[in-house]
Amino acid sequence: MKKVQDFYFKKAKEENYKARSVFKLEEAQNKFKFIKASDNVLDVGCSPGSFSQYMLNKILKSGSVVGVDILPNSFAHQRFTFILGDIKDMDVTTFNNTLFDVVVSDAMPNTTSDRETNHFRSISLCRSIFDLAKEVLKENGNFFIKVFDGKDLQDFKKELSEYFNSVNVFKPKSSRDESREIFLFCKNFKKLR
């Protein structure tokens, strides 16, 4: 456990990334290839910026990232725009009616020592993020989101499957073994009429 944490923590520092979470996105991208070089991406819960940093440095050659978070972000890049605020107060007009090719989120709620409470808070946050994603994702866009595993996961996956051609559960090697975090990769968004 600790060795894995130390390895990814050190690797992030060596590669000048803001957080070890970057390797979770890197693993998912290597597996699913869901972000293309020209994509416009919305990064929800983007602070401290490692997802955005990775996408702009390694994948997006002409694309851009808009990051949103309730916490300030110190990451800067010419193709990165940061919006400070709560996603529950946002809609497509927040982004000047721009639609995104991909929405990613490594956001997590405030946690407690109770795993079940953490799961329910995570599902609630994910549903709020998904509500925003439904407004801002392009047809056939992709959605990648962190969630804490638990008893409401299957219901949430079922909700997602109504809007996407496929929903895959992904547990990165860079996640801590004891962590209940998993990611859902949702491919090819379809707007329900």
Swiss-Prot record:
Subcellular location(s) of the protein: Cytoplasm
Active-site annotation: K146 (proton acceptor)
GO MF, any single term: rRNA (uridine-2'-O-)-methyltransferase activity
Domain of life according to the entry: Bacteria
Enzyme class per UniProt: transferase
Catalytic activity: uridine(2552) in 23S rRNA + S-adenosyl-L-methionine = 2'-O-methyluridine(2552) in 23S rRNA + S-adenosyl-L-homocysteine + H(+)
Documented EC number(s): 2.1.1.166
Entry keywords, A to Z: Cytoplasm, Methyltransferase, rRNA processing, S-adenosyl-L-methionine, Transferase
GO cellular component: cytoplasm
Binding site for S-adenosyl-L-methionine: G49, F51, D69, D86, D106
Pfam families reported for this sequence: FtsJ (PF01728)
Family: Belongs to the class I-like SAM-binding methyltransferase superfamily. RNA methyltransferase RlmE family.
Annotated function: Specifically methylates the uridine in position 2552 of 23S rRNA at the 2'-O position of the ribose in the fully assembled 50S ribosomal subunit.
Protein name: Ribosomal RNA large subunit methyltransferase E
Organism: Brachyspira hyodysenteriae (strain ATCC 49526 / WA1)
Gene that produces this protein: rlmE
